[in-house]
């Protein structure tokens, strides 16, 4: 299925889920405080500064239900609602000073300490620091690329370089097994957190958490085209298989590193979880029109 067809398929289904929305106006606010007032647990200027200064998503990414930033924020708000006394501070695309080896970086790690990476959201809860990397619709229309050559060069690593290079090569050799689950991005984030693990000594446990969107049976039942249903169901099943295999690989790396206080997990949230919080907002209609269907 091509991207245009997939976009149309999702649009039709979401319109059925929310039949009272006309999707005809164009009144979306510039200030996301109006749309997400419940997210403003920190001063607005500080939050916008994190986004503007980060290397990742720009400030307006917070509007987009199909952006990784937005999905990670939704995940956080669900936890915040369930654990109001336990969450300790949200960070939006906060610069955490983690070097990554990327093609656009001229100097190789570990010498280039200027390069900073962005995780969508990270927070502390129950003596555990969660680093959240999220994906919304990307697995349904994108593919996974192999690690660049820099990740295969042992000179670019610090502690336990042999282990990291071994798994970097193993990952690339089996990259076809992760055609739609972005294992390479998770590998990079895990490496980055490991390289700066001393920063997190104040917290006894670390979790790299991959958050994804669950396409429910209710949503699939709203899709008219049998061909589209077949495509999405197969893609969903494949994603589940690749995700399980990827999480297993990442935790094997952690085990070999004897990194006892770290782990990798995956958690799904469906459309009701993600959209329910803002459905009654006066700007929800245009929000959905602009961004939900702008894959």
Task: Describe each PLM feature range.
Residues 1-109, 295:
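Nuclease-adjacent, charged terminal/linker segments that flank catalytic cores
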Residues 122-131, 194-200:
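Active-site beta-strand-loop-beta-strand hairpin of nuclease catalytic cores
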Residues 142-144, 193, 217-226:
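A short acidic (Asp/Glu
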Residues 112-128, 212:
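Catalytic centers of nucleases
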Residues 222-295:
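Polybasic (Lys/Arg-rich)
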Residues 121, 135-145:
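A short, conserved, highly charged catalytic patch centered on acidic carboxylates
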Residues 95-100, 108, 128, 136-139, ...:
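Short, solvent-exposed loop/turn segments at secondary-structure junctions
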């Amino acid at each position: 299925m091509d991207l245009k067809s997939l976009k149309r398929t999702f649009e039709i289904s979401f319109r059925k889920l929310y039949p009272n929305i006309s999707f005809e106006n164009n009144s979306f606010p510039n200030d996301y405080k109006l749309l997400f007032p419940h997210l403003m647990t920190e001063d607005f200027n500080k939050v916008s500064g994190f986004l503007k200064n980060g290397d990742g998503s720009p400030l307006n990414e917070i509007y987009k239900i199909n952006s990784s930033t937005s999905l990670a924020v939704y995940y956080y708000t669900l936890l915040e609602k369930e654990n109001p006394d336990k969450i300790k501070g949200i960070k939006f695309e906060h610069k955490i000073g983690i070097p990554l080896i990327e093609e656009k970086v001229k100097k190789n790690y570990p010498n280039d300490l200027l390069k900073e990476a962005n995780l969508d959201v990270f927070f502390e809860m129950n003596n555990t620091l969660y680093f959240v990397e999220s994906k919304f619709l990307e697995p349904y229309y994108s593919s996974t690329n192999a690690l660049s050559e820099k990740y295969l060069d042992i000179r670019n690593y610090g502690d336990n370089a042999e282990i990291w290079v071994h798994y970097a090569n193993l990952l690339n050799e089996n990259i076809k097994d992760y055609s739609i689950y972005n294992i390479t991005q998770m590998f990079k984030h895990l490496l980055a957190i490991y390289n700066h693990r001393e920063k997190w000594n104040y917290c006894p446990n670390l979790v790299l958490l991959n958050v994804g969107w669950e396409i429910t049976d209710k949503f699939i039942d709203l899709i008219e085209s049998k061909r589209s249903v077949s495509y999405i169901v197969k893609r969903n099943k494949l994603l589940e298989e690749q995700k399980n295999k990827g999480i297993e690989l990442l935790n094997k790396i952690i085990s070999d590193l004897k990194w006892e206080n770290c782990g990798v997990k995956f958690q799904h949230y469906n459309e009701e979880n993600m959209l329910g919080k803002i459905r009654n907002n006066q700007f929800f209609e245009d929000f959905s029109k602009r961004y939900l269907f702008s894959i």
